[in-house]
């Protein structure tokens, strides 16, 4: 894609690709049939729906392979990263009887922080892991916040404001050893640093693939 030409047309150079990215022409081309010819409901077992279902299945397999997921069925498509984060927090909290605590950091994306505020107003306890002036966190403090009432720990993989990359693999391992599910918002990490879900103890990595250049159906 030619961001230089795009910037010239709009009077500047676009440097905000971590927020959203110009659609790759190959992606536009790949999606065209599903915006015109193949418009059927993927859940319908007729001639209009079956090709769409096959395309979604293929896309799920591609994403699973890209992220190193063990099975394609582990991939859940949502409309956006915010919906994915909400799915992780709500599902973890309400599916585990007797567990009403969440461990997270004060530097998460608003999709996490605002949801935690809402859950807190409805009885959940949110334990915030301190972050230093340099954006670093303490693994020992993280471990100290985990207990038998912890439903989920959620720490972003890479911070969208500071650029800090957090030791998600180590955090997930600590959470696993305490029987706590671990979620990471990896929107800023995928396609920039190696991600292999088979090599981590991540329970859910739901809010990741939002960059338009990643998917080619």
Name what the model sees in each region.
Residues 1-217:
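Pyridoxal 5′-phosphate
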